[in-house]
Regions:
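Glycine-rich anion-binding loops of enzyme active sites
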Residues: 37-41, 48, 82-172, 295
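Polyanion-binding loop/helix "lid" in catalytic or ligand-binding cores
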Residues: 182-224
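Small-aliphatic-rich amphipathic alpha-helix that forms the alpha element of a beta-alpha
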Residues: 60-84, 105-113, 199, 203, ...
């Protein structure tokens, strides 16, 4: 016989709250959060839906870890240190206890890796697909949060890691493309389990003028920066950093560049800064590739130049939530 809601909380989720006093062992109506003097609370929330944000063939522990990581990426973009989270899950009727046990083990693994703690939440049954939401809390020194609105004329635009891996990884998982076997494995892993750039975020507080995580696509998320900062951007296509697998795919078909620039789920950081040598030092310190891809310019458009200096246009700037 499956456990009831309260038995599931006691068995699978209460252990995740044991090390955080303010969680009150998940036995009160709400949790307690205290801020040190001189620190601000950063709050973000994300929802993932089966069949939309994850395919459904993933193991429950991977689903749990992706749920946390997409919001951890938001904290990273603002330079915040993870603190705690709440969890809301709507699961189909009849979801077995062993699914929840594996799901909670994934949460436990990433709590240990990223120093974050469960402090509350809710669970319900649904006749539809699984809907999973997490609200994350982080902290930053007062006035040090990196926002989208600080970019100014002449700033250099940088991006961490490589772009396009996750969107092609989704295509691999759906068997829509068939790349090299090793490329397939790497690209699919980038889609299924993103790596939030928390260490980079902490370093960017000293260097970046504006930042955003790349969840909806490079062009869309850079567009969020330019809109908030009331400026434009000029990007050089040949400077966009690609993994070897994505490079082979775009070399086979140059139309795939649109997917690189507008596909989401990379969870890298796009940011602006004035001091390129400072950013290079951060890259060396973290052993993380950080690439200059363009500059902030006047106007409001995000323009892309190809290798011949010609302007490129795309039908969509990135993923839009309906």
């Amino acid at each position: 016989m499956s456990k009831n809601e309260f038995e599931r909380i006691k068995s699978f989720f209460a252990p995740l709250a044991e090390s955080f006093d303010g969680a009150l062992s998940l036995k009160d109506d709400a949790a307690l959060l205290s801020m040190e003097v001189g620190r601000e609370l950063i709050v973000t929330t994300d929802t993932i839906v089966k069949g939309v944000h994850y395919i459904g063939d993933e193991t429950p522990d991977f689903i749990a870890r992706k749920l946390l990581r997409v919001s951890l990426s938001d904290l990273a973009a603002m330079g915040a240190e993870p603190l705690a989270y709440t969890l809301n899950i709507a699961l189909p009727h009849g979801t077995p206890d062993n699914w929840l046990e594996a799901f909670s083990s994934g949460l436990h693994a990433d709590q240990a890796e990223f120093g974050i703690h469960l402090i509350g939440g809710d669970s319900v049954s649904t006749p539809g697909p699984a809907v999973l939401s997490a609200t994350l809390f982080g902290t930053v020194k007062t006035g040090e949060a990196v926002r989208r609105s600080g970019a100014s004329l002449g700033d250099i635009i940088f991006v961490s890691g490589t772009i396009g891996d996750a969107t092609f990884g989704l295509s691999v998982a759906r068997q829509e493309i068939n790349a090299d076997k090793l490329d397939n494995k790497i690209l699919e892993a980038r889609y299924r389990l993103p790596q939030p750039r928390l260490r980079l975020g902490c370093c960017l507080k000293e260097a970046a003028t504006a930042a955003a995580d790349i969840s909806d696509g490079l062009l869309a998320d850079l567009g969020h920066i330019t809109e908030a900062s009331a400026c434009g951007a000029l990007i050089n296509l040949e400077n966009i950093p690609l993994s070897s697998g994505v490079r082979r795919l775009v070399d086979e078909d140059c139309d795939r560049w649109e997917k690189v620039l507008t596909g989401g789920d990379d969870y890298e950081i796009v940011f602006t800064a004035r001091n390129q040598s400072c950013v290079a030092d951060i890259s060396d310190k973290l052993n993380l590739p950080i690439t200059p891809i363009g500059r902030i310019v006047s106007g409001t458009a995000v323009d892309i130049l190809n290798s011949r200096g010609g302007a490129m246009t795309f039908e969509a700037a990135g993923y839009k939530h309906c």
